[in-house]
Structures are given as C-alpha cells and as structure tokens.
Amino acid sequence: DIKVTNNSWPDYVFEENYPIMGIRNYGNYFEKYKHLPGMPTAAEIKAQDGFELGAMQVKLLEKVEEQARYIVELQTQIDELRELLTTKK
C-alpha cells in the first residue's frame, strides 16, 4: 500500500465563491490547449521527469468535483427546459 499524506483536499470546489469556468469556455479551453485547465500538459510532465503522486491525486479529485458541478448545472438546465416544454403543451 502507498499512503500519501496531504493537508490540502479540494472540498473548496463546492464553496459558493469557487470560480468555475463556464461550460462553453471549459470546452473551448481543452479544444485549444488539448488538456484540462489547471492540469499539467504531457510536455510539462515529461520535462519534470514525472509528477508527485499526492499532488496529482489532489488535482484529479479537484477535476472530478468540478465535473460533478458541471453535471448538476446541466441537469438543472435540462429540468428547466423540460418544465418549459410541459407548460407550452
């Protein structure tokens, strides 16, 4: 077993004041740069001869939590559109 000790955990992603990129900007970012915002590029990892496992684990969890926020946001939009459709019938 590998135990990584890290005092920083990305629960801050769920704080109201956490700045999350708009979903269209998010898509535009990785279309342009070919990696997720806030994540190192393949070239950066290669230049550093690898990465720190604990720090990368935190970044990956941060991205998972951001994805959860996007999913909830999209579901809210879907629900609102469904409501509009049912009231128009």
Explain the meaning of each model-derived region.
Residues 26, 32, 64-70:
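A broad "ordered helical/assembly scaffold" signature
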Residues 1-56, 77-89:
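C-terminal intramolecular chaperone/autoprocessing and neck/assembly modules of extracellular spikes
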Residues 55, 65, 73-75:
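Intrinsically disordered, low-complexity regions enriched for glutamine and histidine
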Residues 53, 57-60, 67:
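A detector for long, heptad-repeat alpha-helical coiled-coil rods in eukaryotic scaffold/tether proteins
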